[in-house]
Amino acid sequence: MIDTDRLIAAQPQGSEVHVDHAIRPRRLAEYIGQPRVREQLDIFISAARKRGDSLDHTLVFGPPGLGKTTLANIIAAEMDVDIKSTSGPVLERAGDLAAMLTNLQAGDVLFIDEIHRLPASVEEVLYPAMEDYQLDIMIGEGPAARSIKLDLPAFTLVGATTRAGLLTSPLRDRFGIVQRLEFYAVEELTEIVVRSAHLLGVDAERDGAAEIARRARGTPRIANRLLRRVRDFAEVRGDGRLTAAIADQALNMLHVDRHGLDHMDRRLLMAMIEKFDGGPVGVDSLAAAISEERDTIEDVLEPYLIQQGFMMRTARGRVVTRSAYEHFGLTPTDAVATAVPLTPPGESDA
């Protein structure tokens, strides 16, 4: 099964947490990309500060690695308040959430990552806390049990999720601000790589940064990870300068091609071409052919390949596109020309 150790995995890897923290932007002015989100948050934060209020509860959603945690920290910094961070799976009992809520000061930010994974019992405690700044606590057991209400200071809940569709309607409706993060353009990722290289003390040419950006799958976390690996290559095989040629050599050595595909992506596409004549093929047959789990194909591999137009989902199964054949220098089959997509290229319902 594929894990997050793939070089182009969007999920964080334990070894890079301290590095990511060092290069993470602290203010909205430093945040690159997502212009719509930045503009709206700038207005909402400025208005809240002008009134002396806490910011409305904010939900940030989108694919992993796009900067949801970074935005939560920026919101706290711009509001000049403290931030307490946790995640949905960690809050197993209502008491866990109650302990965090009662330790908040007025205006503080409570950041809950993977908020879609909150247990139902914990989520119910969150409703009155978000809406009325009150905490309902049960004291005693059996017939003697009674409920008391504790007043909470006005705080801002920032929730982050990669699966907004899994949020319950009552929870989603309690967020006054909802922001979706989109994949980054190559130009934006180039700026991010240039900035990160400067902070890491890497002598990077703009062409070298652009070469990394083109292969980063629209994701800053991947771009920064590739930057660190190319830096290593430049120090050992070059003179330490990050040029386009050095970046190309390093990423080719790491099997990340010009479209950001790695060996697992290419293995999946080639299995469809060589073993199933380009499709259509069912996902279970495909999983057996490459010895991977169905969920891995649907949740990890397919979304990017569909988004980039290398694969289609049709009513009869998965089909590789003309672009996939051309990527490998092969001639498309007749099935490619007649396939009707169930999911349009560039979208994924995984």
From Swiss-Prot:
Keyword tags: ATP-binding, Cytoplasm, DNA damage, DNA recombination, DNA repair, DNA-binding, Hydrolase, Nucleotide-binding
GO biological process, one term: DNA recombination
Annotated compartments: Cytoplasm
Residues reported in the UniProt entry to bind DNA: R294, R313, R318
Record-listed Mg(2+) binding positions: T69
Keyword Hydrolase annotated: yes
A Pfam cross-reference name: RuvB_C
The enzyme's E.C. designation: 3.6.4.-
Region feature Small ATPAse domain (RuvB-S), mapped onto this chain: 185-255
Residue span of region Large ATPase domain (RuvB-L): 4-184
Record field: catalytic activity: ATP + H2O = ADP + phosphate + H(+)
Domain of life: Bacteria
Region of interest: Head domain (RuvB-H): 258-350
Binding annotation for ATP: I23, R24, G65, K68, T69, T70, E131, D132, Y133, R174, Y184, R221
GO MF, any single term: ATP binding
Keyword S-adenosyl-L-methionine: no
GO cellular component entries: cytoplasm; Holliday junction resolvase complex
InterPro entries xrefs: AAA+_ATPase (IPR003593), AAA_lid_4 (IPR041445), DNA_helicase_Holl-junc_RuvB (IPR004605), P-loop_NTPase (IPR027417), RuvB-like_N (IPR008824), RuvB_C (IPR008823), WH-like_DNA-bd_sf (IPR036388), WH_DNA-bd_sf (IPR036390)
Domain remarks: Has 3 domains, the large (RuvB-L) and small ATPase (RuvB-S) domains and the C-terminal head (RuvB-H) domain. The head domain binds DNA, while the ATPase domains jointly bind ATP, ADP or are empty depending on the state of the subunit in the translocation cycle. During a single DNA translocation step the structure of each domain remains the same, but their relative positions change.
Record-stated family: Belongs to the RuvB family.
Reported function: The RuvA-RuvB-RuvC complex processes Holliday junction (HJ) DNA during genetic recombination and DNA repair, while the RuvA-RuvB complex plays an important role in the rescue of blocked DNA replication forks via replication fork reversal (RFR). RuvA specifically binds to HJ cruciform DNA, conferring on it an open structure. The RuvB hexamer acts as an ATP-dependent pump, pulling dsDNA into and through the RuvAB complex. RuvB forms 2 homohexamers on either side of HJ DNA bound by 1 or 2 RuvA tetramers; 4 subunits per hexamer contact DNA at a time.
Oligomeric and partner information: Homohexamer. Forms an RuvA(8)-RuvB(12)-Holliday junction (HJ) complex. HJ DNA is sandwiched between 2 RuvA tetramers; dsDNA enters through RuvA and exits via RuvB. An RuvB hexamer assembles on each DNA strand where it exits the tetramer. Each RuvB hexamer is contacted by two RuvA subunits (via domain III) on 2 adjacent RuvB subunits; this complex drives branch migration. In the full resolvosome a probable DNA-RuvA(4)-RuvB(12)-RuvC(2) complex forms which resolves the HJ.
Protein name: Holliday junction branch migration complex subunit RuvB
Native organism: Chromohalobacter salexigens (strain ATCC BAA-138 / DSM 3043 / CIP 106854 / NCIMB 13768 / 1H11)
